[in-house]
Amino acid sequence: AIAMRLAVTQPDLVRGLVIARPAWSILAAPANMRPNAEVGELLSSMRPEAARQAFAASGTAQRLAAESPDNLASLMGFFSREPSVVTAALLASISRDGPGVDADQLRRIAVPTLVIATGMDLVHPLTMAGELSRLIPHTRLTEITPKGVDRKAYVAEFRDALDDFLKGRCSSPGACTR
């Protein structure tokens, strides 16, 4: 979201744009950010261990365990982050936030753009990446192996996609699509 905003507000500073696992497109407080908000709400109303247990028993955690285990692992990590009051406020703020750009502004981005995304990621959905790749001209959408499937492949494919983009190997349509 920050990189998109910079590309829109300070285009003279941007030669290329990389958007990795986007959680926002143009709307603030998208539904995919709700799990972060839930964790923040629990941390603001309970002690961290009780909040962790409540979240682990929730429908959200069960869905994440089945569909997006890496997201669940990340969210569970917030319960041990100190100070918990700051973590709660940060999660609430991030969940309500947005990129502060609209579709017309994204359509005016005039630099090569790489969007990297994975399946099995409910907080950073592949559909969000697809939406951004349709809105921003000169975009290559690269889908890589989800961390929850194979972390080593995820890291290697992420690195390769970024390397290809930065070396200018993504100049033709589909060149960076796996």
What are the functions of these language-model segments?
Residues 119-121, 146-147:
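Acidic beta-to-alpha connecting loop that harbors the catalytic carboxylate
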Residues 22-31, 62, 123, 151:
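A short beta-to-alpha transition loop/helix N-cap that caps and shapes the active-site region
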Residues 138-178:
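Catalytic active-site module of serine/aspartate enzymes centered on a nucleophile-bearing elbow/loop
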Residues 122-128:
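Conserved alpha/beta-hydrolase "acid-adjacent" motif
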Residues 109, 115-117:
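Short beta-strand/loop motif that positions the catalytic acidic residue
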Residues 70-102:
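Hydrophobic, aromatic-rich cap/lid helix
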Residues 14-15, 136-139:
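Core-facing hydrophobic residues within beta-strands of well-ordered domains
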Residues 4-45:
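Flexible "cap/lid" loop of the alpha/beta hydrolase fold
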